[in-house]
Swiss-Prot record:
Disulfide bonds: none annotated. Residues 284-305 are annotated as: Disordered. One of its GO terms (molecular function) is ATP binding. Gene3D superfamilies: Mur ligase, C-terminal domain, Mur-like, catalytic domain, NAD(P)-binding Rossmann-like Domain. This is UDP-N-acetylmuramoylalanine--D-glutamate ligase. It comes from Cupriavidus pinatubonensis (strain JMP 134 / LMG 1197). GO terms for biological process: cell division; cell wall organization; peptidoglycan biosynthetic process; regulation of cell shape. NCBIfam families: murD. Pfam families: Mur_ligase_C, Mur_ligase_M, MurD-like_N. One of its GO terms (cellular component) is cytoplasm. Pathway: Cell wall biogenesis; peptidoglycan biosynthesis. It is found in: Cytoplasm.
Length: 503
């Protein structure tokens, strides 16, 4: 289970969901376990003590003595190597020659062990990106199931990959396909995972406090395709330069985007008669040798482009998930599933059935011809840009919160194009106001989210959308993004009742 390491004494850093899962897994597989957390009494300590009584727990700042007798460090994804205390401990581990793995590396080693021991060789599909990970992961899992395969969905989406693997082993229900949502934090400490197909949906600024730079952030995302030389089908967003830069030399990635696809097997959008269609590019044998113009090759090879025709799959409006950004998520999911040869017709049936994930451009209510949408999961600038562009309607935007040191200037253009007004909340309200000052949208402050909903309702006109898409984290005003969404929905319900409408 641990590669060349034989049941090492494991130091688990951090006791969140992933840390607890790693401690459980290592203990279950015969390792002595020491767990360290900078908190003296983390919430999961009670579960650790109940489930793994032999584990040693050390609370408080990390000290180098934690490494004494240790053969493997298993680090939780929330711990940044740039944080001084964590960074010093990791440097000391490297100096002692102690490997540092994350949960997904433990998962990858476990799959390799199971294949060697019993021949278990599932397909693995992996998904990352700044925005759209959870929707694409959940949708991919649904499509795999609709195509008749048993599937396990895990990772950043929860449950943890190791907890899910343990449960599958215990119940003798190992799946045909694993669908993994992976964050940049998880990928940073993943070394041997080799998925059959993987996608980076997009890369926009986020978590720079954790990674230190956009270059480091993008490099972590690119680790999803596995070690150099592994045969992973790359599924790339051709509308995103940073993801297309990840194409491996000499390979032809599958691409998706909101334009027409130009390479066989890629997905895109055909606009016909004012209606956008999802389409698949197929080789056009009739075009061979007829002197028809060649399409520009979009992949990384220097081979001559293959003429393609565009097969209509379904109108984008037939999707229950709203917005063109969700259409791109759907195309990424289709591409991943086709990479493991799942039948297209079954996948399209599943696509029509999928109704989306909570708090991701989720419709809440229609009040006096104004629609209210909850995109509380939009915790960065890129997510809000995607929501504004994807809805393609006049919007009153509610934005603000904990800014995380982001540059808000990329919001100015879509706000100018789509927003009637922006209601500003939270700690970053002033920074947002500065960034949007010249956009032409009315900028209004609100002290609370409830006040923001009422002000947005006053500003909106019939046919508009009131969109909560904060472009910020929630912790300055709320417990988390789910709590923020609950407050928003409650405020919308109160607004409906005040106007004599049953929500």
């Amino acid at each position: 289970m641990f590669g060349e390491l034989q049941k090492p004494h494991v130091l688990v850093l951090g006791l969140g969901e992933s840390g607890l899962a790693m401690a459980r897994w290592c203990g279950l597989n015969g390792c002595a376990v020491r767990v360290a957390d900078t908190r003296e009494a983390p919430a999961n300590l009670v579960f650790l003590q109940a489930e793994l009584m032999s584990a040693e727990f050390v609370g408080g700042p990390f000290a180098e003595s934690l490494l004494d007798g240790i053969g493997l460090v298993a680090i939780s994804p929330g711990l940044s190597p740039l944080e001084a205390n964590t960074g010093e401990l990791l440097a000391a581990a490297r100096q002692r020659g102690i490997p540092v793995w994350g949960e997904i590396e433990l998962f990858a080693r476990a799959l390799a062990h199971l294949q060697a021991e019993s021949g278990y060789a599932p397909k693995v599909l992996a998904i990352t990106g700044t925005n759209g990970k959870t929707t694409t992961t959940a949708l991919t899992g649904r499509l795999v199931e609709r195509a008749g395969k048993s599937v396990a969905v895990a990772g950043n989406i929860s449950p943890s990959a190791l907890d899910k693997l343990s449960a599958c082993i215990a119940s003798a229900t190992l799946p045909d396909v694993w669908v993994l949502e992976l964050s940049s934090f998880q990928l940073e400490t993943t070394h041997t995972l080799a998925p059959h197909a993987a996608t980076v949906l997009n890369v926009t600024q986020d978590h720079l406090d954790w990674h230190g730079s956009m270059e480091a952030y993008a490099a972590s995302k690119a680790r999803i395709f596995g070690p150099a030389g592994t045969a992973c089908v790359q599924v790339l967003n051709r509308n995103d330069r940073l993801t297309m830069d990840m194409a491996r030399p000499g390979t032809a990635p599958v691409t998706f985007g909101t334009d027409l696809p130009e390479t066989p097997g890629s997905f895109g959008v055909l606009r016909e008669g004012g209606m956008p269609w999802l389409v698949l590019a197929e080789p056009d044998s009739e075009a061979e040798g007829e002197g028809k113009p060649r399409r520009r090759k979009a992949d990384a090879t220097a081979q001559e482009a293959v003429p393609v025709r565009h097969k209509r799959l379904m109108p984008a409006d037939a999707l229950h998930i709203r917005g063109m950004h969700n259409a791109t998520n759907a195309m990424a999911a289709l591409a991943l599933c086709r990479a493991i040869d799942l039948p297209l017709n079954a996948l399209l049936h599943g696509l029509r059935e999928y109704r989306g994930e909570p708090h991701r451009v989720e419709w809440v209510a229609t009040i006096d011809e104004v629609e209210y949408f909850d995109d509380s999961k939009g915790t960065n600038v890129g997510a809000t840009v995607a929501a504004l562009s994807g809805l393609d309607k006049r919007v009153v935007l509610i934005a603000g919160g904990e800014g995380k040191g982001q540059d808000f200037s990329p919001l100015a253009a879509p706000v100018a194009q789509y927003a009637r007004a922006v209601v500003l909340i939270g700690r970053a309200a002033g920074e947002l106001r500065d960034a949007l000052q010249g956009s032409g949208a009315s900028l209004v402050d609100a002290a609370t989210l409830e006040e923001a909903v009422n002000k947005a309702a006053e500003l909106a006109e019939g046919g508009d959308v009131v969109l909560l898409s904060p472009a910020c984290a929630s912790l300055d005003m709320f417990r988390n993004y789910v709590h923020r969404a609950e407050v928003f929905r409650s405020a919308v319900e109160e607004l409906a009742l005040s106007r004599g409408i049953m929500p």
